Amino acid sequence: MHHPSRRQLLKVAAACGSVGALGLSAPAIGQGLTKVTFTTSWIPEGPNLFAYVARDKGFWKKNGLDVSVARGSGSGAAAQAVGAGTFMFGMGATPTVIIQAAKGLPITCIGQINYDALMGIGVPANSPITKAKDLEGKKLGASVSSGEYPFLPLYAQKAGFDLSKVQLVQLDSKVRDRSLTERLVDAVAAFGSSTIPSLASTGSDVRFLLFKDAGVEFYGQSLTTQPARVKSEPAVCQAFVSGAMEAIRFIMTEPDEALDIFLKANDEVSMTSSGKEYARIGLGLANLTNLVPEVLQNGLGWADPAKVKAQSELILQYAAGQGAKMPDLAQLFTNQFVGKIKFTDAELAKARKSVEPFRKYVA
């Protein structure tokens, strides 16, 4: 029988010591990394950039996980895939997840990725439209299939303008942004998180009047899993959320390095002439939406139960459709795994400085 030499044993001990220094949990050392499947809600872009950083910078590995990242084809499809158990974890637009839950999908939001869906009205940067009232008498491009469309009447009511005096131009969402740059319409109803990077990265300056500023507020995107997993595998859920939130803190304080990591992981983005700028602006906007009281007071990922209730009630009233029922919000949202990752004063200062160039788009 072969007996290991003292030198070999010392090498093993040193290796274990270096792993321990990385902060890996005992199960990760003893049993290897736990394999986890995760789907984003869309193609690689700013709002899901954190996932590639969490994977490739080692934040998930540090928490004992080997996470595969799949690209999604929309928040609705991503939510359904998670609810069905096709993926262990996912992400999606929070309003869409609430709608799916209201229709009976078993799903739980386990951490906020960002805090504003940036629903609003996009106009050229030099447009004379500076407030919602200015939309009266103008052409507003809108797509009935887009998530913000059902809330236009509520926005008009809250922002103090007469929607009947606005000329609504129905557009396919694929040509909506282009219609604005070609001045076929004066403004568009859209998600700023998508439209702003799309237009600004190709040289078309744009700014948004946000629904949020009129009191119509919705969270941006949530991490999701199945309710059963929260109960059966809380340690895996905790490791997944912790790694994601550490990555979000990193992309907010070191956005340039984060962007480099993302581009190396997604060649198709870096190969296009506007791809890097598209990702940079998308990341900046996502980071901007995370500098909110929820994060500053309670840590990254924390969801305000009062806001969740108010947002869910609006979604049920305006967007969920027939047959939808108010989901059990205590099951739909949990803060069990969040609140542990926070900013130091120095990190917060860096994060605030890094988002300044992006405020002009939503000022």
Where are these regions (language model features)?
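N-terminal secretory signal peptides and thylakoid transit peptides that target proteins
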Residues: 1-17
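A glycine-rich, aromatic-flanked flexible loop/lid motif
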Residues: 18, 212-219, 280-286
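N-terminal signal peptide c-region/cleavage motif recognized by signal peptidases
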Residues: 25-27
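Short, glycine-/small- and polar/acidic-enriched structural segments
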Residues: 29-182, 186-193, 209-210, 216-217, ...
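Pocket-lining segment of extracytoplasmic ligand-binding domains
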Residues: 95, 175-177, 185-274
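Secondary-structure end/capping motifs
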Residues: 233-322
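Conserved C-terminal helix/tail region of periplasmic/extracytoplasmic solute-binding proteins
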Residues: 308-363
